Amino acid sequence: FKQKTAYEISLGLVGSEMCIRDRVMTAPFGSTDESSILHDDLRTDLFGEQKDGLTNIASRFKHEIGDIQKAFEESEIIIEKEFNTATVHQGYIEPMNVTAHWNNDSRVHIWISTQGPFQIREETARALDMRTSQIKVTPMEIGGGFGGKFPLYQEPVAVLLSQKSGKPVKIIMTRKEVFEGTGPTSGSYVKCKIGATKEGKIIAAEGYLAYEAGAYPGSPVEAGGKCMFACYDIPNVLVEGIDVVVNKPKTAAYRAPGATNSTLATETIIDEIAKKLSLDPIDFRLMNASKEGTRRADGPKFPKIGCTALLEAMKSHPHWNSPIEGENIGRGIAIGFWFNGGGPSNCSIGVNQDGTINLVEGSPDIGGSRASIAMQAAEVLSIDYKDVYPSVTHTDNLGYSGGTGGSRTTFATGWAAIEAARDVKQQMIARAAKIWGIEEKDIELKNGIFISNSDSELKLSFKELASMLIDTGGPITGKGNISPTGVGGSFAGNIVDIKLDDETGKIDIVRFTAFQDAGKAIHPSYVEGQMQGGSVQGIGWAINEEYFYDKDGDLKNSTFLDYRMPTSLDLPMIDTVIVEVANPGHPYGVRGVGETNIVPPPAAIANALYDASGIRMNVLPMSPAVVMENLLNNS
């Protein structure tokens, strides 16, 4: 007797028919005519237009500047290679979980560890055909996200179960469910071709990218294409890419999504050209580095950026100038680019009678953003940052705020805090003017003191004035609502020394120095923490991590025991160098620092491996088995 599963029973109830199709596991295969068609209604989108014919290619893009064909004809050295990267997961420690409570007033309260509470509210309402105002989402302290905790997963199910049961319902994914059911980042195929003159000027670059979207459309392939050659001032560029559905979990963001894959190709070829031209790899990059006014292939020109300053910092660092000692030791470098996001952010600031302030914002803190946001508000109000008490609130308390991702939080939500603090400052000046009976324009806030410019005897500290608010017109609350567009961008670089075990193919990281342009490091130790964390994840991506599927398409390493992420036992201390080239699109020059740091490590490690062994790798991860195979073939 075989007991039927709930799934089998449900198939019988609804009279379903199942059509078994051949698996599609990679983007290159999924884009061919030989592959199975996974969706009966999917057609390729090209800049908003749907193309005829069923396909697994969900979308296609193309960016071009200059005359690429002529530029390659004029190039004196051309290198073209193909690269493949495996599917990898963000590896957050806390699994997906949600608690929902359907109340008697037909409103539902959701508690969830998410990077985007307002997005969860909107998507849950859309999924369940509810009004947005019926749903309140409270973001909890989040145990890691890295871009992977934006999508909607169990929330609608928990809401419906709570409605039916009349009780709160909590759902927690197992680790296996996290790996198999939530969004990893894309596996990819990248083809890269770069042409240069004998003097070392890059004049042509071409890229083709095919990224896995998972079961449904939406890979970061276009972002990868925009970042692919962004570090360099190249007059002739062509980048094309496709988003391909495959039989894997629907992808989600992972720190600078798409950029790490494409940068592996660009930076290893850049390194190879430098070697063939007998040029120092940093000098070669400096000769061709993007600067203010450089136009990217997708159109925009860079404002003031820190690419050359970053490379100069790398060139002058003791790590670069120290000797390489020991057998099978190699040194490599790479640089990378990622955008800063803007988007809507809201913040409110309330002044307390003791002179402290409560700052309320709607973007969850997953990297110390509460501290950096509070410090920006304190700067405006000329008070001690310890007097600012920041908190992240639920969706009923504040206007719509974008989530914590895209390197936007310290930048955009910090800017909202600046605007709220400016509102408080102006209201405090107006209150002081009312108390003193003078014009507002006659009052300034200096070093925490409100001072009359015409009468030096008229002055009140921030705390003194705060204590008088209730009796002189009532409390003061400031509002900040902003959606910045001048968001800039960030560059990161690595110098890495590796040791290769030529008997096993194992790569050990001996020394690692991370560089990043932070614009203005509001909280330097938190910036360093972000740089170190992203670097470690980039190292894991380079040498350990991958989704391993068997011939039947089943994931075989869906636990932390089998999905090998680096730990402190595998790594040296990650040294950090913060470069500060102020972002002209922010009041304090801030650039996002949470993502760019994951972009260059795989390429830097691949270049170090070449320096140690003479072999060029074009796959991720560079696991011992893959490296050993290349060593044997090379010998």
Regions found by a protein language model. Name each.
Residues N328-G336, L555-I574, N583:
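A glycine-rich dinucleotide-binding beta-alpha-beta segment and adjacent secondary-structure elements
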Residues S10-G12, S16-E17, R21-F515, A606, ...:
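Structural alpha/beta core scaffold segments of enzyme domains
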Residues G540, V593-N618:
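C-terminal substrate/ligand-recognition segments
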Residues Y389-S391, T567-V590:
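Generic long, charged, amphipathic alpha-helical segments
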Residues F1-I9:
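Short, exposed "boundary/linker" segments that immediately precede the start
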Residues G519-H523:
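Cytochrome P450 core scaffold surrounding the K-helix E-X-X-R motif
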Residues S525, G529-D562:
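Active-site "cap" helix and flanking loop/linker of ATP-utilizing ligase/carboxylase catalytic domains
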Residues P257, R408, V579-N597:
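Amphipathic, heptad-repeat alpha-helical segments used for oligomerization and assembly
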